[in-house]
Structures are given as structure tokens and as C-alpha cells.
Amino acid sequence: MIKKEIIILCGPTASGKSYLGHELAKAYGCEIINIDSMQVYREIPIITASPIQIYNTGIHYHLYNFLSITEDFSVIKYLKLASEKIREITARGKIPILIGGTGLYINLLVFGYNNIPDISQDVRVQVRNLHNEIGNIELWNKLEKLDPIAATKINHCDTQRLIRAYEVLMHTGKSIFSFHTAQKERILSDFNFKIIFLNPERKFLYKTCDERLDKIFKDKAIDEIALIKKQFTPKEYANLKAVGIKEIIAYLDGNLTLNDALNVAQMRTRQYAKRQVTWFTHQIQDKTILEYSTQEEFEQILRNLLFTLKS
């Protein structure tokens, strides 16, 4: 059986993924699927530079801005939704293009995931309340008594992994590492993935990061976050990790000037982009790397891709 093809455009923030994907989709009738963990939320299209906020030319976009920040969501739920969209698109004879920079989503979608059941909202709330009450060290001590294998592999300072391990234990009665050693589930094993990694030269990347944040701050991002502060509690928007949100909140609370908020957000965006480049370089092995150091070189890459796909 000939496997159908999926294109993944990945790379650091502000590297031109959305523009490149939009132009490819426009030329060949492809449909675009989001693979960015923050662009799923409907309340923050500006601060996350959602492409459906930028482009409005009839291209079919999927899994963008469809979820409220108050709704429970997980990587497993994302994988199920994305795989459904991929099969729907290919059944129509179209090629899906997945665009984003969330490495975890890409890695699990392509290479498979450990089939840990979805953690119930009740368990999530209970564990987080417990953590808020007793802190990392006491939670780690509890984990050590119930799951010594996990405790030996998780540092008590690693809050995210610690909470995750305790959630899995409470929900399933099993160690999280029992799932890690099981065979991975590949929900799209009948597809071929063509992974294209955009890797701009560092100086050029930092320039585009700064320019993006400057534009976002001028493009009503302040109003967007102010509305979130008005409509939701701090607990409800605490999990929004998109760079710029924390800085704008600090500005709205009077703790930073607008210029300082922008400068801090730009610095954090550059740091985030650097981490993304490092992750994609080392974690995704089978990929096509596109390197460029000017906008002109980037435009030439687009022309080359259009020609390659046409042939």
C-alpha cells in the first residue's frame, strides 16, 4: 500500500513557518493544521500570531483558536484531534500541512506516544491543590513512598514532572514509568511524514523575533490580555505560556512600563527561539533543513519549494 504524505513545517518562533505554509497551501490546495500548543486558544489570537488572524484568503485552517482557556486540554487530546483532521483531509484527496513549533506534539505525532490514559479533571485539581498546600518536597516524599521508581528518576525541583507522575499514579494506580517502557502507539503509522525544519541564522532570527513582538504589542495585544484579565481569574489563565502574556499583565498591573514589558518579552522570545532550535536540531533526526540569513534567501527557499513540489 502506498502511504499518503503529510508535510510538517517546524522551527523556532518567528521563522516564517506560517507564511511559508500559507503560500504552499495556496499554490497546491493543501489544508493547514495547527501544531502549536498556544494557538489552540480562541482568546489569544493576537499574542500568539495566529495565522487565521493574519491571512484570510480561503485556505482551510484547522485546530486554530477553537478552545477556551478554561477548557481541559492535553497532548493526547491534541493527537486524537490532529489525526482525525489528517484522515479527513487526505480522504478528500488533499495534502495536510502541519505548522508549528511545539516539539512535543510533533515528536509524539510522528514517532508515537506512551498510551497513558487522560487524567480526569478531578484528579488534576486534587493533585494541584495538594501541591499548593504541601509544596514540592512533601509531594516528592509522598511519591517516593508510593512509587519509588518514579521518585528516583524525578528531581524534587522539577515541579511539572513531579505533578505529572503523581497525577498518573492517582488516576491509574500505576507508575508513569510503566507506561514509558510499554510499546509506543503510532496513530498515523500508515502515513509518510516529510519534516521541513526552518533554521534561520541566529542574528536574523533574533531580528525577526524582535520585529514580531513589536508588531504584536502595537496590534491590540494589550487589549487582548486586558480582556482576559477582566473575564477570567488568574487561576484560569495561569497556564497560558505564550511569551508576552506575563509581561503585558505586569504592565497592566503597573509593575512594568510598556517599553520595559516589550523589551522583556523580546528577550524571552529570543531565548525561547534558541531553545526551540536546539530541541529540533537534536530531537528530530529525519528532516530537511532549510537555512537562510536574509529575507531574500527565505523568499528563494519558498520559490524552490514551490518548484520542487510541482515537479
UniProtKB/Swiss-Prot annotation:
<comment type="function">
    <text>Catalyzes the transfer of a dimethylallyl group onto the adenine at position 37 in tRNAs that read codons beginning with uridine, leading to the formation of N6-(dimethylallyl)adenosine (i(6)A).</text>
</comment>
<keyword id="KW-0819">tRNA processing</keyword>
<feature type="site" description="Interaction with substrate tRNA">
    <location>
        <position position="124"/>
    </location>
</feature>
<feature type="region of interest" description="Interaction with substrate tRNA">
    <location>
        <begin position="160"/>
        <end position="164"/>
    </location>
</feature>
<keyword id="KW-0067">ATP-binding</keyword>
<dbReference type="InterPro" id="IPR039657">
    <property type="entry name" value="Dimethylallyltransferase"/>
</dbReference>
<feature type="site" description="Interaction with substrate tRNA">
    <location>
        <position position="102"/>
    </location>
</feature>
<dbReference type="InterPro" id="IPR027417">
    <property type="entry name" value="P-loop_NTPase"/>
</dbReference>
<keyword id="KW-0547">Nucleotide-binding</keyword>
<dbReference type="Pfam" id="PF01715">
    <property type="entry name" value="IPPT"/>
</dbReference>
<dbReference type="GO" id="GO:0006400">
    <property type="term" value="P:tRNA modification"/>
</dbReference>
<dbReference type="GO" id="GO:0005524">
    <property type="term" value="F:ATP binding"/>
</dbReference>
<keyword id="KW-0808">Transferase</keyword>
<comment type="subunit">
    <text>Monomer.</text>
</comment>
<comment type="similarity">
    <text>Belongs to the IPP transferase family.</text>
</comment>
<feature type="region of interest" description="Interaction with substrate tRNA">
    <location>
        <begin position="36"/>
        <end position="39"/>
    </location>
</feature>
<dbReference type="InterPro" id="IPR018022">
    <property type="entry name" value="IPT"/>
</dbReference>
<keyword id="KW-0460">Magnesium</keyword>
<protein>
    <recommendedName>
        <fullName>tRNA dimethylallyltransferase</fullName>
        <ecNumber>2.5.1.75</ecNumber>
    </recommendedName>
</protein>
<dbReference type="GO" id="GO:0052381">
    <property type="term" value="F:tRNA dimethylallyltransferase activity"/>
</dbReference>
<feature type="binding site">
    <location>
        <begin position="11"/>
        <end position="18"/>
    </location>
    <ligand>
        <name>ATP</name>
    </ligand>
</feature>
<feature type="binding site">
    <location>
        <begin position="13"/>
        <end position="18"/>
    </location>
    <ligand>
        <name>substrate</name>
    </ligand>
</feature>
